[in-house]
């Protein structure tokens, strides 16, 4: 499917959270994302690939650790090898150039964005932590049932457990997109984005910041 709208995007590293004062003397919690060394490594076009997109590389890596096919790919783009690569479908892909560097100035303060990342892994979790179940009563004869899920299906009807039943299991460590966050400030000198609120992932996690797909 061909992209019909212009989308900007950058890969960056989540440095953590802090708080800053705004112009109304309100304390705003922000997430700091460092998005330096983004570069265009490939251009997709409708004639050859069937769709238009740009491929963005991010993060330094020892050239000795790069496979020969990837080394040739980066050499063709005229850039040093990058650790992370992501593809962004955008209608204005033809306006980019191979090897072009992208900066945080793609975004502006007040702009709505989406942030994609991998959530923190929580390990094996019960239904109360994983799905917000209330559990069983704390007294009145409840015996070692306080954090159990309760019934997961009748014996004769439906005599099975439905697919998708919320149960205990591995929690977190999944790809997650947070929509319609706001850019609080842009520090071009330090390649920093200050984003209002929280974004998925732990400190040091690589995240993808793009213009909001749903506007808001």
UniProtKB/Swiss-Prot annotation:
<dbReference type="GO" id="GO:0019843">
    <property type="term" value="F:rRNA binding"/>
</dbReference>
<dbReference type="InterPro" id="IPR019927">
    <property type="entry name" value="Ribosomal_uL3_bac/org-type"/>
</dbReference>
<keyword id="KW-0694">RNA-binding</keyword>
<keyword id="KW-0687">Ribonucleoprotein</keyword>
<dbReference type="Pfam" id="PF00297">
    <property type="entry name" value="Ribosomal_L3"/>
</dbReference>
<keyword id="KW-0689">Ribosomal protein</keyword>
<dbReference type="GO" id="GO:0003735">
    <property type="term" value="F:structural constituent of ribosome"/>
</dbReference>
<comment type="function">
    <text>One of the primary rRNA binding proteins, it binds directly near the 3'-end of the 23S rRNA, where it nucleates assembly of the 50S subunit.</text>
</comment>
<protein>
    <recommendedName>
        <fullName>Large ribosomal subunit protein uL3</fullName>
    </recommendedName>
</protein>
<dbReference type="GO" id="GO:0006412">
    <property type="term" value="P:translation"/>
</dbReference>
<feature type="region of interest" description="Disordered">
    <location>
        <begin position="137"/>
        <end position="158"/>
    </location>
</feature>
<dbReference type="InterPro" id="IPR000597">
    <property type="entry name" value="Ribosomal_uL3"/>
</dbReference>
<keyword id="KW-0699">rRNA-binding</keyword>
<comment type="similarity">
    <text>Belongs to the universal ribosomal protein uL3 family.</text>
</comment>
<dbReference type="InterPro" id="IPR019926">
    <property type="entry name" value="Ribosomal_uL3_CS"/>
</dbReference>
<dbReference type="GO" id="GO:0022625">
    <property type="term" value="C:cytosolic large ribosomal subunit"/>
</dbReference>
<dbReference type="InterPro" id="IPR009000">
    <property type="entry name" value="Transl_B-barrel_sf"/>
</dbReference>
<comment type="subunit">
    <text>Part of the 50S ribosomal subunit. Forms a cluster with proteins L14 and L19.</text>
</comment>
